[in-house]
Swiss-Prot record:
SUPFAM superfamilies: Cytochrome P450 (SSF48264)
InterPro entries: Cyt_P450, Cyt_P450_E_grp-I, Cyt_P450_sf, Cytochrome_P450_monoxygenase
Keywords on record: Glycoprotein, Heme, Iron, Membrane, Metal-binding, Monooxygenase, Oxidoreductase, Transmembrane, Transmembrane helix
Pathway: Secondary metabolite biosynthesis
Entry GO MF terms: heme binding; iron ion binding; monooxygenase activity; oxidoreductase activity, acting on paired donors, with incorporation or reduction of molecular oxygen
Pfam families associated with the record: p450
Residues given in the record as heme binding sites: 483
Subcellular location field: Membrane
Phylogenetic lineage: Eukaryota, Fungi, Dikarya, Basidiomycota, Agaricomycotina
Membrane topology qualifier: Multi-pass membrane protein
Annotated protein name in UniProt: Cytochrome P450 monooxygenase 81
Statement: the UniProt record of this protein carries the keyword Amino-acid biosynthesis: no
CDD domains in alphabetical order: CYP_FUM15-like (cd11069)
């Protein structure tokens, strides 16, 4: 074949590719054009900048609550994106036909680059094998064995904060302390490794990397959607070189953060592998005494059949995945709880009295701690009203029909009881919309009211359940790809609150707090700061003396 024809052939191929893209775009737009939603802000980026903007919380709430259980926003070049909070539709997407509705290419590419081939970045048979190996170590039975580890960490946190407020109430960045606490809890309970002595100010290398990850990713949010098209470009060394010399500093920052996380995970894995090879005595001398998740996981993997065993690369990736998933989400939720308790001092005092009456500060058995009603209500209500993660998506691998539990009225007045969804359409999972719909939760659904969990939930919730794995909520998602560690997170929050509220009071400062949109929502002082923090006025609680 003559090389003279190559430019012509490339031009034809490019034209065909553009034509196919435009045809697909027209097809999806014509099918979904009748779904209600806000107008595009831009012909090029649609509503993406509004949705993913750092201050996009109001826009997300508007889409979640003002356009019905199914809405439409616009992506690149006007391509429609569905927002789905309808219970029947969610059941179809996440459970009944989960093999049809896959995570987006952007999600898989991003999580692979961040954490490696772990649970978040895999699908199909590889994901099934990983999940099968992981399920036992996240069971309630195993959580019970980890409770002493949790209390041990929290007593160190208690002593450290006590030193800082012994002379009177002080302003303390509780997001930082919750981040250090969550990292140490997953370190000891998950990896059998101590990251932080929790005495000195400051944090360690891994903690700093995690703290800066979400703000850094947020600043390249729209750019991240292009990753599926470039992340396999050339060999790995070439991609790393491109990132190193990329003109945007945030991209280089993200690379350095990922490098730090991967290096730390590899070092921890290597030390655990040596201890396991030496035998039980060496393992018992490690933090967690061999009861941590990774020690049990590595032992189980070594004894698994060849068909079920996973390679070391995937085990290391699980460590990075655990550390990320169990640190930012839980620490930011705990910071949100403390802020809400500062806003609602009566609830704070009632919760404190419940905890003190149960003697939950020093140690409490798993089932007893889990049964404290107001503590449970505070955790559930915060997870309902303020889900930390709201930007999860699926994409159908074929044209499909999405059934609805209630009809949607189209922009032309047509009543739709099902929706034809073209292959490749991005579907945003309506976590916030599902958790807060007035039709399910009542007129006060937007309000933070922990006491709603102290009595039976309304029939509109119990008789029309969503498929979420946790408490009629979508916060931890549903189906085979639901959050595997939600019980770990719930127990962590309850132990933290039991110890902190037994010893300290929390009040607001005069600094304005802004919660920002990112992969995991995070707080800053004001809307312009890039530093994730939540300052609260912390004082010692004076326990009543017994007469």
């Amino acid at each position: 074949m003559s090389t003279d024809n190559i430019p012509t052939q490339l031009g034809i191929a490019g034209a065909v590719a553009v034509l196919l893209f435009l045809l697909r775009r027209w097809s999806s737009r014509s099918t979904l054009r009748n779904i209600p939603g806000p107008p595009p802000q831009s012909q090029w980026t649609g509503n993406l900048k509004q949705w993913f903007a750092r201050d996009g919380a109001d826009f997300q709430r508007d889409v979640s609550f003002n356009y019905g259980p199914v809405a439409k926003i616009h992506g690149f070049l006007g391509r429609p994106i569905l927002y789905v909070a309808d219970p029947k539709a969610l059941q179809t997407i996440l459970v009944k036909e989960e093999q049809v509705y896959q995570e987006t290419k952007a999600f898989f590419a991003m999580t692979y680059l961040l954490f490696g081939p772990g649970l978040l970045a895999t699908a199909g048979e590889k994901h099934r094998k990983q999940r099968k190996l992981l399920n036992p170590v996240f069971s309630i039975k195993h959580m019970r064995h980890m409770l002493p580890i949790f209390y041990g960490v929290l007593h160190k946190v208690r002593d450290a904060i006590t030193m800082r407020v012994s002379d009177g109430p002080q302003e303390i960045d509780m997001l930082k302390w919750m981040g250090r606490t969550a990292l140490e809890l997953i370190g000891q309970g998950g990896l059998g490794y101590s990251f932080d002595k929790l005495v000195e100010d400051g944090d360690n290398e891994y903690g700093r990397a995690l703290k800066h990850l979400q703000p850094t990713l947020q600043r390249i949010n729209v750019l991240r959607r292009l990753i599926p098209y470039v992340y396999k470009l050339g060999p790995a060394w070439f991609r790393r070189m491109v990132m190193h010399y990329f003109p945007l500093g945030q991209v280089r920052d993200a690379k350095e953060i990922v490098d730090t996380m991967q290096r730390c995970s590899s070092e921890i894995f290597a030390s655990k592998k040596i201890a396991l090879a030496r035998g039980d005595e060496a393992v018992m001398k490690q933090v967690g005494e061999g009861k941590d998740i990774m020690s049990i996981l590595m032992k189980a993997n070594s004894m698994a059949s060849e068909a079920d065993r996973i390679p070391e690369e995937e085990l290391v990736a699980q460590m990075s995945t655990f550390l990320f998933a169990a640190t930012d989400t839980t620490s930011n939720t705990l910071a949100r709880i403390l802020q809400q308790l500062a806003i609602h001092p009566d609830t704070q005092q009632k919760l404190r009295e419940e905890i003190l009456a149960a003697n939950a500060e020093e140690y409490m058995a798993y089932d007893d701690l889990d049964a404290l009603p107001l503590l449970d209500g505070v955790c559930r209500e915060t997870l309902r009203v303020f889900p930390g993660v709201t930007n999860l998506a699926r994409t159908p691998t074929q044209d499909t029909i999405l059934p609805l539990s209630e009809p949607v009225v189209g922009t032309d007045g047509t009543v739709m009881r099902e929706i034809l969804v073209p292959r490749g359409t991005e579907i945003l999972i309506g976590i916030q919309g599902s958790n807060g719909r007035k039709e399910r939760w009542g007129e006060d659904s937007y309000e933070w009211k922990p006491e709603r969990w102290l009595s039976p939930l309304p029939k509109t919730v119990t008789e029309n359940p969503v498929p979420g794995v946790y408490s009629n909520l979508m916060t931890f998602m549903a189906g085979r790809r639901a959050c595997i560690g939600f019980k770990f997170s719930e127990m962590e929050m309850k132990v933290v609150l039991a110890v902190l509220l037994s010893n300290f009071t929390f009040e607001l400062t005069d600094k304005p707090i802004q919660w920002n949109i990112s992969g995991v929502r995070y707080p800053t002082v004001g809307k312009d700061s890039n530093v994730a923090q939540l300052p609260l006025k912390v004082g010692l609680y004076k326990k009543p003396t017994l007469q």
